[in-house]
Amino acid sequence: MAETTTIDDEHGTLNPEDSGFGLVFRNLDNGVTNMTTCATGYYITKSGRHAMARDLFEACAEAGYTGAMTWMSQLDNNGLGGEYNPDAAANWDRRAAEAGDPIGKFNYGLDLMRGHGVTQDMTQGRALVDEAATEGLEIARRLQGADYDLDEVTPDADNWKYAPLF
């Protein structure tokens, strides 16, 4: 099979990549963060390339994509592609919540209720969970139905993360 050469010059691009990770990262290099480019981060992180996904999600989050903010929180909260950083994870959740994202509201509500990455505030945390539930987020409704028992929505394998540090 012959190698295809891509040439960029003042007249345009000969044989441009029109799909795949090459296009995604060329888009990022050129400051293009569209929904298709940002959604590719899911496949990248699920393939175990967390540092690469982190680069993509961070650019998309900075461009205002709340789904990418949620993914940045997940990466920081689990030490994927970087250090475990609950403060950074909570900050991404807060940004998504402030942007009006129901998942961001739910996640930041959990952060506040647990005091994970932020100062604990049960009242504000419940209020955010309630907003997410009102907006139709089923897991938020489930937490309300369990009288805000966090074990309802959190695997017990994660309990070590949420234990007090003192």
Residue positions per predicted region:
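Long, contiguous interaction/recruitment modules in multidomain scaffold/adaptor proteins
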Residues: 1-28
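Structural signature of tandem alpha-helical TPR/SEL1-like repeats
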Residues: 14-19, 46-55, 82-92, 119-128, ...
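Alpha-helical segment of the N-proximal tetratricopeptide repeat
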Residues: 30-59, 63
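Hydrophobic face of amphipathic alpha-helices that form TPR/SEL1-like repeat modules
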Residues: 37-44, 69-78, 105-114, 143-150
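Residue-level recognition of tetratricopeptide repeat
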Residues: 65-67, 101, 137-139
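Terminal, low-structured helical/coil segments at or just beyond the last alpha-helical repeat
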Residues: 133, 139-166
